[in-house]
């Protein structure tokens, strides 16, 4: 749905804004206390988590039974056993998690949207800088070792974004072994209806006593399957209302609304490339660099209407329900968004397990992020003017923490976090809303009529 335009003259000069956020937290945890595990994790369909070690709830390695939070874990074995192909499908196995059938991969946790949840991938915050959303398709599901979900506010440990909880995703990384050189290949080829592909190939290799490397490539795509169904409420017919009579009664849903059709086939093409190298420095001390590249294109095509007149589907007009009621159709409701995303994520992590010290520095660079939408479409195959909203952004994050766990009955965690975020949104007029490069310069140079920026 198109936002209201704020037409203005642009000078092209770039604004800058810089500030810094620092978070310091110290937690005292009574290790000998008897903790009651939250009831909503005792669900029969949930993966077994008894005696599982978690690090997300308290930022320390702790038995999940002793954790004072509602925590659930999904492992790579759960993903393989249940043939899960997306991160959202993996999380949907857990209680309190709902996957939206409308949004592309949208999640709700205890009623909160994913924009209220902090998502970490190997320590890299994956929430975007524009609206705090998460692009789940950017995460290579077949490289995942485990997913930890902590429900409830976690601001004291992770900052203000963890209102609904924290999702911590760890990918598989082989650890160096003594005088062992080996290589492990993994992969899969999947094909399904609607031109669906799910392919993955990768390896982990021990190249020396101190160094291991790994790389994985993944592609998931589909030509589309019906999604985002459209409904409407009936209104009273007035003397001035012009209506058409459908060939058949309009389908009605249980809530009394009428099923008008759908946006059509929800297609996407997602490609991921990930790599890492780990160097063993000393005993129980290591340095790891990891990289993730992802590119995704998504769109709705071939919209469908449940209403026909004289055998032809219609997408606009007032459709007569009976002598007193009608339902209005608007072509714009049948056309979805056309989106494009491209990210680079870099992560450098130092771990000293002996002294329980961890330092992480990462960058999430969203080179491309945005979508286009049509302006006043009059046919379902409309390829005329539209709007493009493009909002790339960057997150730079530094995190360090130290744990002291031999202090009587208590454990002390001290840490510091520094984060810098920025984004720049550009809105342009397009001659063809499906073509992100078809800038309409009739009114504004390059079609650019609005710029919004933000930084923290």
Locate the predicted segments by residue.
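N-terminal Sec signal peptide and the immediately downstream disordered periplasmic leader
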Residues: 1-82, 89-94, 279-283, 310, ...
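Extracytoplasmic beta-strand/coil segments of soluble accessory domains associated
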Residues: 56, 88-125, 145
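N-terminal periplasmic accessory domains that precede
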Residues: 87-90, 105-108, 135-140, 149, ...
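Short acidic/polar hinge/loop motifs at secondary-structure boundaries
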Residues: 125-153
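Extracellular loop and loop/strand-boundary signature of outer-membrane beta-barrel proteins
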Residues: 131, 184-189, 198, 258-263, ...
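Transmembrane beta-barrel wall of Gram-negative outer-membrane proteins
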Residues: 191-222, 231-301, 340-353, 406
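Flexible loop and strand-edge segments within Gram-negative outer membrane beta-barrel domains
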Residues: 222, 264-270, 284-349, 363-394
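Outer-membrane beta-barrel transmembrane domain signature of Gram-negative proteins
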Residues: 337-341, 383-456
């Amino acid at each position: 749905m198109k936002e209201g335009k704020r037409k203005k003259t642009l000078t092209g000069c770039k604004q800058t804004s810089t500030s810094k956020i620092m978070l310091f937290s110290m937690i005292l945890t009574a290790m000998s206390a008897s903790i009651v595990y939250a009831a909503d994790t005792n669900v029969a369909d949930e993966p077994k988590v008894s005696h599982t070690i978690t690090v997300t709830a308290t930022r320390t390695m702790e038995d999940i039974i002793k954790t004072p939070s509602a925590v659930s874990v999904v492992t790579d074995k759960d993903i393989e056993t249940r043939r899960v192909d997306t991160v959202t499908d993996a999380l949907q196995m857990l209680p309190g998690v709902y996957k939206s059938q409308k949004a592309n991969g949208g999640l709700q946790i205890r009623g909160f949207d994913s924009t209220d949840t902090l998502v970490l991938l190997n320590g890299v915050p994956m929430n975007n800088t524009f609206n705090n959303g998460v692009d789940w398709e950017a995460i290579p599901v077949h490289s995942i070792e485990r997913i930890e979900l902590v429900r409830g506010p976690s601001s004291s440990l992770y900052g203000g974004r963890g209102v609904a909880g924290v999702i911590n995703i760890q990918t598989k990384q082989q650890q160096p072994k003594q005088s062992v050189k080996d290589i492990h290949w993994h992969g899969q080829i999947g094909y399904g209806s609607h031109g669906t592909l799910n392919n993955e190939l990768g390896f982990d290799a021990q190249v020396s006593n101190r160094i291991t490397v790994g790389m994985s490539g993944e592609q998931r795509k589909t030509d589309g399957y019906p999604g985002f169904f459209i409904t409407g409420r009936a209104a009273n017919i007035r003397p001035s209302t012009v209506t058409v009579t459908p060939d058949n009664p309009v389908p009605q849903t249980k809530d009394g609304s009428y099923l008008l059709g759908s946006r059509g086939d929800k297609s996407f093409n997602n490609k991921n490339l990930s790599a890492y190298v780990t160097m063993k420095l000393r005993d129980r001390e290591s340095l790891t660099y990891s990289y993730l590249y992802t590119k995704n294109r998504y769109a709705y095509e071939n919209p469908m209407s449940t209403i026909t007149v004289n055998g032809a589907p219609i997408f606009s007009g007032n459709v007569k329900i009976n002598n007193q009621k009608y339902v209005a159709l608007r072509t714009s409701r049948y056309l979805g968004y056309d989106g494009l995303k491209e990210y680079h994520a870099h992560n450098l992590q130092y771990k000293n397990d002996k002294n329980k010290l961890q330092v992480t520095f990462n960058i999430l660079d969203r080179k491309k992020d945005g979508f286009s939408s049509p302006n006043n479409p009059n046919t379902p195959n409309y390829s005329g003017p539209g709007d493009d909203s493009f909002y790339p952004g960057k997150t730079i994050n530094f995190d360090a923490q130290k744990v002291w766990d031999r202090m009587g009955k208590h454990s002390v965690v001290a840490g510091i976090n520094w984060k810098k975020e920025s984004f720049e949104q550009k809105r342009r007029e397009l001659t063809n809303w499906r073509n992100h490069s078809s800038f309409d310069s009739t009114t504004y140079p390059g079609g650019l009529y609005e710029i919004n920026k933000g930084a923290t």
